[in-house]
């Protein structure tokens, strides 16, 4: 979905109390100059407890991560997205379910690496990231060597990373980087998987499936 279409999304912002409960906003200036003053991506810093933490990068309107939070109340979940209106919908979804174990951060994840903490994450989800269709945008793709390096530092040994894309070119890049990296073990014998049928699908997944796009997937484990 293009940013223009996302910009036309009609959604009412949460009231101040609800926003304070669920939402954090980090500007690029804060992340670049004041990262040490911001809470890190860990359960103690975000939730004040020691529960396992799972991270959804590019969570959109929150269908998938809210399902995860409902299904596992003994863990914490944080969704990151750059688009505030999408997060407003995600917050409404969390509020309607009265979820106590979820927060959302409005920020550019590429600037959030200083907030990662060693072995703080049980799982990371990167589902349907922006492929940057135009050649000049491809160098800005989130999934790259730096992403793999930072996730290896942040994910606990035995933790996992789930990667899903409908873009064949992005998939080929992911496959090449994973095979070259060597620090992650596939949770499946095949080089990759096709199809993705979670109990709750995001609006992006539904949209691409309606268009008949092939979905490529990797499930990785940090040894």
UniProtKB/Swiss-Prot annotation:
The protein's Enzyme Commission number: 2.1.1.33
Swiss-Prot/TrEMBL catalytic activity: guanosine(46) in tRNA + S-adenosyl-L-methionine = N(7)-methylguanosine(46) in tRNA + S-adenosyl-L-homocysteine
Catalytic site: 130
Database matches in CDD domains: AdoMet_MTases
Binding site for substrate: 134, 166
Any Pfam family: Methyltransf_4
GO cellular component: tRNA methyltransferase complex
Sites where the protein binds S-adenosyl-L-methionine: 56, 81, 108, 130
Keywords, alphabetical: Methyltransferase, S-adenosyl-L-methionine, Transferase, tRNA processing
UniProt cross-references to PROSITE patterns, sorted A to Z: SAM_MT_TRMB (PS51625)
Function of the molecule: Catalyzes the formation of N(7)-methylguanine at position 46 (m7G46) in tRNA.
Family designation: Belongs to the class I-like SAM-binding methyltransferase superfamily. TrmB family.
NCBIfam families: tRNA (guanosine(46)-N7)-methyltransferase TrmB (TIGR00091)
Protein name according to UniProt: tRNA (guanine-N(7)-)-methyltransferase
Organism annotation: Rubrobacter xylanophilus (strain DSM 9941 / JCM 11954 / NBRC 16129 / PRD-1)
Gene: trmB
């Amino acid at each position: 979905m293009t940013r223009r279409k996302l910009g036309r999304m009609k959604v009412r912002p949460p009231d101040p109390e609800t926003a304070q409960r669920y939402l954090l906003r980090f500007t690029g200036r804060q992340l670049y100059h004041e990262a040490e003053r911001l809470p890190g991506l860990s359960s103690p810093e975000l939730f004040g407890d020691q529960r396992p933490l799972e991270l959804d990068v590019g969570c959109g309107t929150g269908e998938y991560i809210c399902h995860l939070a409902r299904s596992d109340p003994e863990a914490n979940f944080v969704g990151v997205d750059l688009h505030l209106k999408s997060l407003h919908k995600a917050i409404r979804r969390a509020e309607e379910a009265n979820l106590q174990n979820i927060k959302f951060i409005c920020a550019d994840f590429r600037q959030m690496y200083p907030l990662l903490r060693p072995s703080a994450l049980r799982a990371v989800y990167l589902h349907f990231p922006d492929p940057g269709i135009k050649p000049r945008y491809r160098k800005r793709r989130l999934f790259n060597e730096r992403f793999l390096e930072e996730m290896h530092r942040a994910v606990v040994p035995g933790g996992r990373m789930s990667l899903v894309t409908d873009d064949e070119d992005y998939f080929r890049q992911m496959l090449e980087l994973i095979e070259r990296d060597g620090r992650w073990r596939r949770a499946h014998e095949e080089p990759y998987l096709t199809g993705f049928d979670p109990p709750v699908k995001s609006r992006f997944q539904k949209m691409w499936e309606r268009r008949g796009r092939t979905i490529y997937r990797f499930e990785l484990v940090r040894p």
